[in-house]
């Protein structure tokens, strides 16, 4: 039985699926629909979404199109990269990190317009339904959540197209539109479906939209210097930029040199395995450079603790727990560790590779040439190492005296 909902805020892309959802909400719930379209760097013109919403009967005052690129990078991407977060050893969480912001703004708009419901276009098989809805529960005011893919009987492409045609929804395929299921933002672009559903099948070369093939990348490498303040990149080659500008420029450079392609099978939060291909050129550069500046500015214990908690942090982001107390606790610890992560990193970009050429920090460098030199020095007495080793071996010595063997 459907709940009585008067006004619903829909996460609306302007594409076929969410346009069908918009009409379906009007027909099935007899409710007023408010559309929210976020610009998080997907690289598409968003004004057509306004025209489509108007054509489907949405009031002009109920159409929200907002540029969230700076907020997305500053408050979501950068905090995640301070953690060096990678899911299952490879995935840089480009889709996962975008959902909390959309859910947050949807909940805020619902409060603003007095809506009592929210809706999204995520399917009942994927991770995004979890990410969106955990956000609604964390931030919304007793909102009714409508997930059409879990309710309707439009469970095939043919049925969706028939519904669209019946209701006058434009189903014209855009020129050059990919046949894959794609999701893009300023951090990455993802591809799923079709031949990718066979994990043994290599993706077609023309699938990749952002990056050139590494073998077709320039034969001459490019060297850049990234400046860091408190763990965040703030400049490229000495030029200060905003967070979104930094990521945009690193994307351009990385894509030019064939950097950031990834083909993986991941474990979804709902239990199944999924094959996905990703392009994350700027993020790949940022991760390598951030670890490099940390290598000279972080204390050993702090660095190792960060590495220990990173998989848990990444799992929380992947599974939709961005707003959870535990993620916020970990973030506070991570942000504390970044107070002295200041300096710059020289990076070489060449045919799909990111190579660190150097790292420096004027005020926070813990690398001491005086201590680590292989030449004669006056600050380190090598005899001190003998006692250190004996203390660390004490448990072995005691165990052997008690007859225990280690071979």
UniProtKB/Swiss-Prot annotation:
Binding site for L-aspartate: 123, 127-128
One Pfam family here: Arginosuc_syn_C
Catalytic activity: L-citrulline + L-aspartate + ATP = 2-(N(omega)-L-arginino)succinate + AMP + diphosphate + H(+)
Residue positions binding ATP: 11-19, 38, 121
Keyword terms of this UniProt record: Amino-acid biosynthesis, Arginine biosynthesis, ATP-binding, Cytoplasm, Ligase, Nucleotide-binding
Pathway noted in the entry: Amino-acid biosynthesis; L-arginine biosynthesis; L-arginine from L-ornithine and carbamoyl phosphate: step 2/3
GO molecular function: argininosuccinate synthase activity; ATP binding
Protein's UniProt keywords contain Ligase: yes
Record GO cellular component, one term: cytoplasm
Domain of life of the native organism: Bacteria
EC numbers: 6.3.4.5
SUPFAM superfamilies tied to this protein: Adenine nucleotide alpha hydrolases-like (SSF52402), Argininosuccinate synthetase, C-terminal domain (SSF69864)
Residues annotated for L-citrulline binding in this entry: 91, 96, 127, 131, 181, 190, 266, 278
Biological-process GO terms, alphabetical: argininosuccinate metabolic process; L-arginine biosynthetic process; urea cycle
Broad EC category: ligase
Entry keyword Manganese: no
Cell compartment(s), UniProt: Cytoplasm
Subunit structure, as described in the record: Homotetramer.
Family: Belongs to the argininosuccinate synthase family. Type 1 subfamily.
NCBIfam families for the chain: argG, PRK00509.1
Protein name: Argininosuccinate synthase
